[in-house]
Structure formats: C-alpha cells, structure tokens
C-alpha cells in the first residue's frame, strides 16, 4: 500500500492512538511495556503541540500532560479501583472529561479539580465511554454485560443516576458478548456504533432502545477492539481488531430500506492488513481531503495511511 507512514514504539506495545483536533500532523499514542501485563507505560507525542492530553493507566489512575511544562504530569486523578480502560474529552465544552474502568463505573472530571465531579454506576466491567459529539450532557458507555447505556446529566441524579436508556447489544435469545468499543456518529447524533467479542459491528438509534440494530457489519475474524466513525462522511466508519486487520465500512444508511424488517447488512469497503499483531487503536484525521487514518497495534508500530486507497479500483489490500 502506498501513502503510508510508520513510527516504531520500540519496547512498548501501543494501546490507543488519537489525532490532535487542532493540527493534522500531530498524533498521541499510549503504550505499555510487556503488552500491558507488567512494567511501565509511555505516551508518545508525535509532533503534538503544547495542548493538554489525558492518559488512562492500568493502575486506575488518570494523568494530565502539558508538553509546555517540564514536570510531567501536571495533574493526577486516582479514584478508579481497577484499570481505567478509556477516557474522552467533552468535545463541546472542552472543560470536562469522562473515564471508564473495569471497576464498573464511569467518572466525570474537571482538569482543574483532583476529585471526580460525578460517578455513574454501570455494575460491570466498562470498556468504553464517550460524550455525544453535539450535546455535552449526554454520555454513553458499553460494558461486559453486552449493553450500551446512555446517561443524560440534565436529569435528576435520583433518576437512576442520570441513566435514560439501556440498549442490549446482543440479539434477543442470543448469549451476551462483551462490548469493547463504541462511537457516536458525527453527523447523526442519535446513532451509535458498537463492537466487541462477537466480531460484529452494530449501529443503534438511541431513540429506540428496543428496536434492535439498524445495521450489522460482519467480516472481522476476532474481537473488534476499536472503531471510529468518519468525521468526513456520515455512513463510513473504521475498525481495528484482534485479527490484526483494520477494516473500512459503509453502514448502508444512505440506501433506502427494503420491505423486510430488521437490520441492514453493511458493506466492507476494504481491508488494511499491514499490522502483524493485535490492532488496538484507530482514529481519523479531522483535516485535509478526508481519509487519513492512524492505526496502532501490539507490533510496536504506528501506521498513518490514506483510507481512500481502500476504496479505489483494483484489489483492496
């Protein structure tokens, strides 16, 4: 594949990658020695500017970094009782962030306060949490009990700790499978995509919790570790998996529904198979022509590449 850049995180296995929301050439990578089993962690700032970034740790802590300050980190937050598995800035107000943990909680934080602002109980290992991209009061989470939960901070705390919707990811009658990742559609803020242990990517309309998935995207051979909707197209998303591939998808939302009820099948647009170990992180660049992607894996590699190549004519590799 042409148009691919590579950086090696020698001695450290990447766990997550994130493009800067301000500069198209700046990427942050979170990594751990010995595949995260034991040892130190390291955050690689590949050209990142002096903007703050938050990193989640295996000891349950969160650390805030500012590359303009010599002393690292500038803030420590430690309330989670087990590994913190995800963290997300509020994309609207930019003054809070949210974290999820294996301790079964989601916590909301301010970068200026050492203690969390609120705790949202999930009750099972919570792999991923996120803010709605257009509404700063809406928070989502997916967990090991195979459910997507939506919280609305505008509701009273007494109302189930702000819980407004619980959506089963697994089909009725099927055994639950751990949900590992999810993301809000950037153009339709009622649509959320999920992925997990059963290798299937599903999309849901949060307004209809009992309606089942809108779309099923099947193709991964092992668990889907990370997914992200495109910031450039409403019907395109990308996913990384333990099958060592990154796949590009179309959720078929632009096509009219047929007479049959049920979820639509999505379309796989292409496969990138240059990683030689588990793919643990994917993200889109917000700038440019729309298509540059960062992917990381346990092969100690950060790959930056143009996903438009996967949609071009000829064999998709």
Residue ranges of predicted features:
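Conserved strand-to-loop turn within each blade of WD40 beta-propeller repeats
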Residues: 30-33, 39, 56-59, 99-103, ...
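Loop/turn segments within WD40 beta-propeller blades
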Residues: 19-24, 87-94, 113, 129-137, ...
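WD40-repeat beta-propellers
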Residues: 36-47, 62-66, 106-110, 148-153, ...
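Blade-level signature of beta-propeller repeat domains, shared across WD40, Kelch, NHL, RCC1
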Residues: 283-317
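WD40/WD-repeat beta-propeller blade N-cap
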Residues: 7-13, 50-51, 77-84, 120-126, ...
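Surface-exposed loop/turn positions within WD40 beta-propeller blades
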Residues: 24, 40, 59-61, 94, ...
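Beta-propeller domains
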Residues: 2-7, 24-49, 67-70
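Short loop/turn segments immediately following beta-strands, especially the blade-tip
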Residues: 46-49, 67, 152-159, 205-209, ...
């Amino acid at each position: 594949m042409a148009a691919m850049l590579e950086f090696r995180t020698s001695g450290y296995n990447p766990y997550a990658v994130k493009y800067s929301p301000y500069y198209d050439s700046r990427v942050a990578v979170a990594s751990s020695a010995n595949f995260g089993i034991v040892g130190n962690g390291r955050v690689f700032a590949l050209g990142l500017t002096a903007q703050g970034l938050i990193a989640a740790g295996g000891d349950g802590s969160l650390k805030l970094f500012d590359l303009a300050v010599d002393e690292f980190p500038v803030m420590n937050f430690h309330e989670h009782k087990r590994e913190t598995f995800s963290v997300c800035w509020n994309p609207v107000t930019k003054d809070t962030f949210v974290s999820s943990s294996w301790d079964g909680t989601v916590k909301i934080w301010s970068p200026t306060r050492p203690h969390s602002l609120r705790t949202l109980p999930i009750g099972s290992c919570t792999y991923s949490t996120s803010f709605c991209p257009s509404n700063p009061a809406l928070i989502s989470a997916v967990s090991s009990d195979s459910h997507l939960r939506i919280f609305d901070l505008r509701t009273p705390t007494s109302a189930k700790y702000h819980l407004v919707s619980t959506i089963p990811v697994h089909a009725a009658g099927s055994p639950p499978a751990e949900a590992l990742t999810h993301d809000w559609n950037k153009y339709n803020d009622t649509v959320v995509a999920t992925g997990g242990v059963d290798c299937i990517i599903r999309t849901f309309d949060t307004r209809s919790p009992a309606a089942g998935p809108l779309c099923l995207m099947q193709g991964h051979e092992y668990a889907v570790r990370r997914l992200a909707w495109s910031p450039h197209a409403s019907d395109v998303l990308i996913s990384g998996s333990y099958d060592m591939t990154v796949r590009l998808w179309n959720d078929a939302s632009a096509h009219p529904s047929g007479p049959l009820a049920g979820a639509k099948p999505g379309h796989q647009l292409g496969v990138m198979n240059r990683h030689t170990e588990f793919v643990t992180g994917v993200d889109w660049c917000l700038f440019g022509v729309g298509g540059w992607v960062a992917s990381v894996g346990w092969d100690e590699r950060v790959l930056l590449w143009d996903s438009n190549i996967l949609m071009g004519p000829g064999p998709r590799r």
